[in-house]
């Protein structure tokens, strides 16, 4: 956003004019910024042509997803609602990955029927349920398993997901148990190892540590994975404009990893694609005086 003639604008359009026409509150998104973010991400990792699946959880607006789809991106979903939204936006099912810790039987069944690329499981019990459902449909499907690499993302504890005390993923012992189970299962094909260590990460070093942990795990098994899903978590700057994730160094670490392991990389960016493209615009309707300060009360609904 920029000020033009003392008016705050987005894409050179006055936010005041938009408010006058449509009322408030509303979300306003910059298409040029969205395009810039996507192209920058694709360019940064073009050396190995990853599958980029937009994390729908970061923005479920079907019109936004539809625009993102035009750049060739797939979708990462964590619920049947997000899956339906991705399909409605025109995302090819062969580019959709279904993640998340609490998939229901009906959600798994729906995902199988839609022939999406992968269902990333979070536990052995979930894999057994996926296998049961696939067997009932007489289908063989591709799945992934999320590994907890015990890697500190150096981010807020509330959004850290890759340490051993976090609820996400399975530990090493369970991971090897899952591999053995899948080898003896006719209806599931374990194709992907998935990791995701946290959100709002601005330092490339936790990613390097994560890749080393994954490499060590792969070296201890003869199972052939087709995909390594590195998740997302790439942060954006809110206050310190000089602190940005170094994509170049992350790319270098991945290339080093790929020299040892011949796999297809999947990314699940969300915030890094959409986070700085939109603005919530509201109107101040009241000013309330309290001790030592004043509160402005905007017209933003709570639902």
Feature locations, PLM:
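Single conserved hydrophobic/aromatic residue that forms the stacking wall/gate
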Residues: 294-303
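A charged N-terminal "starter" segment
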Residues: 1-141, 180-189, 219-224
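Non-cysteine beta-strand/loop elements that form the S-adenosyl-L-methionine
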Residues: 78-81, 99-103, 142-156, 190-195, ...
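Glycine-rich tight-turn/loop motif centered on a GG-T
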Residues: 23-25, 113-118, 157-169, 203-205, ...
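Gly/Ser/Thr-enriched, mixed-charge loops and adjacent short helices
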Residues: 177, 183-202, 206
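C-terminal active-site-proximal or functional interface alpha/beta core segments in diverse enzymes
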Residues: 197-295
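Conserved anion-binding
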Residues: 126-185
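Conserved radical SAM core fold
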Residues: 61-64, 82-84, 104-107, 149-164, ...
């Amino acid at each position: 956003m920029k000020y033009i003639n003392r008016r705050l604008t987005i894409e050179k359009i006055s936010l005041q004019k938009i408010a006058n026409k449509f009322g408030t509150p509303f979300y306003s998104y910059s298409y040029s910024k969205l395009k810039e973010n996507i192209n920058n991400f694709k360019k940064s990792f073009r050396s190995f042509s990853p599958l980029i699946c937009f994390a729908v959880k970061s923005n479920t607006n079907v019109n936004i997803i539809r625009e993102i789809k035009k750049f060739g991106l797939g979708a990462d979903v964590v619920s049947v609602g997000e899956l339906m939204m991705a399909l409605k936006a025109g995302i090819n099912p062969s580019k959709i990955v279904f993640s998340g810790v609490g998939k229901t039987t009906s959600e798994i069944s729906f995902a199988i029927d839609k022939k999406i690329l992968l269902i990333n499981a979070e536990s052995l019990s979930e894999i057994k349920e996926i296998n049961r459902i696939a067997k009932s449909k007489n289908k063989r499907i591709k799945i992934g398993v999320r590994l907890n690499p015990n890697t500190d993302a150096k981010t807020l504890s509330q959004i850290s997901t890759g340490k051993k005390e976090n609820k996400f993923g399975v530990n090493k012992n369970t991971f090897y148990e899952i591999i053995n189970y899948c080898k003896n299962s006719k209806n599931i094909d374990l194709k992907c190892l998935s990791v995701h260590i946290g959100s709002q990460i601005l330092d490339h070093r936790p990613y390097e540590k994560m890749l080393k942990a994954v490499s060590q795990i792969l070296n201890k098994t003869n199972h052939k994975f087709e995909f390594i899903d590195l998740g997302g978590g790439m942060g954006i700057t809110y206050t310190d404009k000089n602190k940005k994730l170094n994509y170049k160094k992350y790319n270098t670490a991945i290339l080093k990893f790929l020299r040892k392991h011949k796999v297809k990389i999947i990314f699940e960016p969300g915030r890094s694609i959409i986070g700085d493209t939109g603005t919530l615009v509201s109107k101040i309707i009241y000013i309330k005086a309290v001790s030592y300060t004043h509160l402005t009360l905007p017209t933003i609904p709570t639902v």
